[in-house]
């Protein structure tokens, strides 16, 4: 339904925004070296304010995910946005300094975010007619290809970004 799709998009946007905020919190010192002109936390808002904003984004993202689970009657698929939220938090806190692992986690999260609408679309169908199965197969293939493209392009982008930011990471 349109309402379920809206909540899926809203949950995704809120969780992604939370991921950016928590990453910027952990990157205050690195950003001061690599991108001082773009630094917001520590210059325009305090670390405490940023952390409170992060918590608000996460709570709203979780609430949207719970509404999504209720609307779709699909708790398993609704766990994916929550899993992505945890991955983004662990990345910012622990894995971002691990060259390959951190890059892989961000790319995996991006790939799943792109794949999420496909999973909801084909996961909610119960019609097993030949035409419906063919349509679902086409949607699944397109979603998987798009998700893989998002994963690979993000992974390569993260590797390049790490090479550019090496001065602030030392």
Where are these regions (language model features)?
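Hydrophobic residues within the alpha-helical transmembrane core of Major Facilitator Superfamily
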Residues: 89-90, 116
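C-terminal membrane-associated helical module and adjoining short loops/tails
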Residues: 55-58, 93, 111-114, 124-170
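Small-residue-rich segments of transmembrane alpha-helices in multi-pass membrane proteins
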Residues: 41-42, 104-121
